[in-house]
């Protein structure tokens, strides 16, 4: 899956992460990942020729369980439907969890501002509602 020029300009981090498989044996599989301002794209190969799995930031609740061992940094992404996805990266490249967390915070802030502006526009577009709300205020 090719990324558009717009997506490429929004890349926050690109590199390798290991993802723990969901099957019974739970092997760690190396994945090429691209974090943008809106999603974490996970590819099976380094050339990004395979179709990516896109984990939208709006579907991520938090980055949790950060643990550092001698060789790896382990962390878990918890989705809004409470699914847990385990990742690890080498200790040399230990800022993946921080960059994902910061991207998530930035995304949530942008969404909150957008929601606030939408609410404000809705209220300013109908002054009758605003007056009736003020009339109810003590």
Curated annotation (Swiss-Prot):
Keywords: Cytoplasm, Membrane. It is a peripheral membrane protein. The keyword Membrane applies. CDD domains: PH. It comes from the Eukaryota. The lineage of its organism: Eukaryota, Metazoa, Chordata, Craniata, Vertebrata. Pfam families: PH. The keyword Cytoplasm applies. InterPro entries: PH-like_dom_sf (IPR011993), PH_domain (IPR001849), PHLA1/2/3 (IPR042832). This is Pleckstrin homology-like domain family A member 2. Residues 117-138 are annotated as: Disordered. GO terms for biological process: positive regulation of apoptotic process. Plays a role in regulating placenta growth. May act via its PH domain that competes with other PH domain-containing proteins, thereby preventing their binding to membrane lipids. It comes from Salmo salar.
């Amino acid at each position: 899956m090719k990324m558009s020029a717009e997506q490429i300009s929004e890349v926050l981090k690109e590199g390798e992460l290991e993802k723990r498989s969901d099957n019974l044996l739970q092997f760690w599989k190396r994945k090429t990942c691209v974090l943008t301002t809106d999603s974490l794209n996970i590819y099976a190969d380094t050339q990004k020729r395979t179709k990516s799995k896109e984990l939208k930031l709006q579907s991520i609740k938090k980055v949790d369980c950060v643990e550092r061992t001698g060789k790896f940094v382990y962390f878990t992404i918890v989705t809004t439907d409470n699914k847990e996805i385990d990742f690890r990266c080498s200790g040399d490249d230990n800022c993946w969890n921080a960059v994902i967390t910061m991207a998530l915070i930035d995304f949530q802030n942008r969404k909150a501002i957008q929601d606030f502006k939408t609410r404000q526009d809705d209220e300013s577009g109908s002054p009758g509602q605003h007056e009736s709300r003020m009339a109810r205020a003590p």
